[in-house]
């Protein structure tokens, strides 16, 4: 079963071509990596999938299919969370937006806290975002994305600005969550090393295009990453 299928997408903003002839597929249960440098078109591609394009955007496509239940986590956890509202209230609001009431919300949130490795005894729910570490903030965002029980999760640059140890922890959480919930994941990053031993398939976006394995930029990118991995070993 296909979770996402896009064929021949072209998108421009104010006459500037942003995405060109994009064809892209994700199967049920797959973890797909999308890598590209800043400005390559990754973020606008994410917004296209989620249906939150700017008014100035115009696009054409041959076909577009996506499952109805999508969760999304974005790059900056601190700006994604309301700094003036405690975590409990923010997650409760998300729960109500999905289910229309607060019935069983506490059991749901406590279960998700355990899933992402946050000890409920430490009272994370009664803290403000600034009282949490970067890794803890990202895990709260993961909980928010999972509340609605999506079968497709988009993670957009979620390991940016995190230290190496925290990056590894977050990646391991995504692996565990994928196995437990059987969801498909689109993991978007500019850091290829993040996707090592994680993604089932890796797409490379370059100047708004998905490039193939023979493209010079892709070859150079993968060769550089292999050299870095060797030096780390």
Task: List PLM regions with ranges.
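The feature captures the beta-strand-to-loop junction immediately N-terminal to the Walker
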Residues: 35-37
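Conserved ABC ATPase "signature" region
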Residues: 104-123
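Conserved ABC ATPase signature
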Residues: 128-132, 136
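A short, proline-enriched helix->beta-strand linker immediately N-terminal to the Walker B motif
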Residues: 147-151
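Catalytic Walker B motif of ABC-type/P-loop ATPase nucleotide-binding domains
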Residues: 153-156
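A short, surface-exposed alpha-helical micro-motif characterized by mixed small hydrophobic
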Residues: 195-197
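C-terminal boundary and immediately downstream tail of ABC-type ATPase nucleotide-binding domains
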Residues: 205-206, 213-233
């Amino acid at each position: 079963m296909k979770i996402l299928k896009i064929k021949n997408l072209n998108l421009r903003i104010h006459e500037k071509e942003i995405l060109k002839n994009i064809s892209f597929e994700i199967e049920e249960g797959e973890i797909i990596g999308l890598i590209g440098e800043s400005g390559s078109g990754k973020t606008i591609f994410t917004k296209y999938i989620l249906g939150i394009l700017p008014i100035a955007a115009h696009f054409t496509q041959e076909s577009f299919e996506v499952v109805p239940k999508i969760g999304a986590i974005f790059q900056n956890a601190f700006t994604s969370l309301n700094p003036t509202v405690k975590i409990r209230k923010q997650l409760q609001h998300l729960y109500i937006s999905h289910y229309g009431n607060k019935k069983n919300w506490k059991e749901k949130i406590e279960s998700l806290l355990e899933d992402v490795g946050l000890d409920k005894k430490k009272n994370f729910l009664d803290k403000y975002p600034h009282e949490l570490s970067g890794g803890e903030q990202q895990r709260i965002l993961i909980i928010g994305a999972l509340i609605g029980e999506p079968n497709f999760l988009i993670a957009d640059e979620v390991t940016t600005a995190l230290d190496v140890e925290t990056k590894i922890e977050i990646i391991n959480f995504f692996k565990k969550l994928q196995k437990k919930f059987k969801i498909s994941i689109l993991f978007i990053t500019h850091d290829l090393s993040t996707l090592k031993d994680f993604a089932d398939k890796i797409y490379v976006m370059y100047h708004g295009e998905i490039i193939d394995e023979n493209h010079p930029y892709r070859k150079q990118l993968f060769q550089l990453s292999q050299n870095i991995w060797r030096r780390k070993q």
